[in-house]
A protein has these predicted regions:
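N-terminal secretory signal peptides that target proteins for export/translocation
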Residues: 1-3
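N-terminal mature-domain region immediately after signal-peptide cleavage
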Residues: 20-226, 230, 320-372
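Extended amphipathic alpha-helical segments with heptad-repeat/coiled-coil character used for oligomerization
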Residues: 252-290
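Short N-terminal edge-element motif at the start of the domain
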Residues: 229-232, 237
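Sec-dependent N-terminal signal peptides of Gram-positive bacterial secreted proteins and lipoproteins
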Residues: 5-24
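Secretory/export targeting leaders with adjacent low-complexity proregions
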Residues: 237-250, 257
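A short secondary-structure junction signal
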Residues: 143, 210-213, 240, 268-272, ...
């Protein structure tokens, strides 16, 4: 019976692209201005650095309702995935994972949903750089994944575990943690590696998509994030890696990447008519930033969030981790008449390898992690 049940297990790995908010029609914007933000920055100590650094193991640990973390050390077959040509579709990723990571016993299916985010890159007073990230969606289960591959850079990334579900009458909680972790390794939505390279995927609400068709190897959106975290030390290396592959947007959704490194390089990578376009920018939300006919296409709320963060960066040339937290708070979903929420906010300390997480807009409580 156990053997029969194991053959019925189905993981549904939902690879989503990022959109501003979870609805196609966004509600009115009431985001905080910079003066209101600055008045709040002095409220309470709320020092994230006072929190203990969380040590992770291969045992998945629940930190609070809807927020867990795990560590994986070893070979999760990324090199094999790339060497065999990558994947030009979510179904192809499914086939690879089924064959190489689940002994052919599991079947993966991929679906898409809409969600949004904001990112910003800024220098600290000590000369190092910080990268902030908000993930906006419905209430979900978030998983922090610390990865230490045999070949590649160590990293910390985040996965929406609502994108991994169990079928055949089994609940996700009953699946082995290692199976869930393996699937999550191929579904990062953001992250930073030991070299300080930060990567985030943001959706652009547009009818166009990305389907590059040349003789290059193929990658999908979240496998591109995993590729960059494992193989790129800085923005230049990340861009060169992306040029080596044909990108295929999962579920046909238009995306752009926000990349930032320890030298202060911060760019948006967009695909217009299947051509990669790179724009220098410290702030990325959910509209096209490249000059041309697509410039500005996106949601109204994403423009509001972009304007708030851009104004903050002009007024405050350097920021520390608390400032980044407050900046992310200023564009979180509780500032808008929006039924969705900011499920997680992250402050990446690119110089030290520290990562601070804030869950569901509770900016009073930080979870500290450190790469290696």
């Amino acid at each position: 019976m156990k053997k029969e049940i194991s053959h019925l297990i189905m993981l549904l790995l939902i690879v989503s692209m990022l959109a501003a908010g979870c609805r196609r029609t966004e509600p009115a914007q009431t985001g905080k201005g910079s003066e209101e933000l600055q008045s709040e920055q002095g409220k309470g100590e709320r020092k994230a650095e006072d929190a203990d650094i969380i040590t992770l193991t291969s045992e998945m640990v629940s930190l609070e309702d809807g927020f867990s973390a795990v560590k994986y050390t070893g070979d999760y077959k990324l090199d094999t995935f790339l060497e065999q040509g990558g994947a030009s579709s979510d179904a192809d990723v499914m086939k690879f994972l089924t064959k190489h990571l689940f002994s052919g016993k599991s079947v993966l299916e991929f679906f898409g949903n809409l969600f949004g985010c904001s990112t910003l890159s800024v220098q600290n007073a000590d000369g190092s750089y910080l990268f902030g990230r908000n993930f906006d969606w419905n209430t979900c289960d978030a998983l922090v994944v610390s990865a230490e591959p045999e070949e590649g850079y160590a990293s910390i990334s985040t996965v929406n575990m609502d994108f991994i579900q169990a079928a055949a009458g089994m609940e996700l909680e009953r699946l082995p943690d290692e199976m869930k972790t393996m699937a999550a390794l191929y579904a990062p939505l953001d992250g930073m590696n030991e070299k300080g390279l930060c990567v985030s995927v943001n959706m652009i609400e547009d009818s166009a998509s990305i389907a590059q068709e040349t003789d290059k190897k193929d990658i999908t959106t979240t496998t591109a994030v995993r590729l960059l975290l494992d193989k790129a030390a800085d923005v230049d290396e990340a861009l060169e890696l992306l040029k080596e592959y044909d990108l295929h947007a999962s579920m046909g959704m238009m995306v752009h990447f926000a990349l930032a490194d320890t030298e202060g390089n911060a760019v948006a990578v967009e695909y217009i008519d299947n051509e990669m376009v790179v724009t220098d920018t410290p702030v990325v939300t959910n509209f096209y930033l490249a000059e041309g006919e697509k410039h500005g296409i996106g949601t109204e709320q994403s423009h509001t969030r972009y304007e708030i963060l851009t104004k903050l960066l002009k007024e405050k040339k350097t920021m520390d981790g608390q400032d980044i937290r407050d900046a992310l708070d200023s564009v979180s979903k509780d500032n808008f008449d929006d039924p969705s929420s900011t499920e997680w906010s992250i402050v990446f300390h690119q110089g030290s390898g520290e990562v601070w997480y804030y869950h569901r807009e509770n900016y009073e409580k930080a979870y500290r992690f450190k790469i290696k």
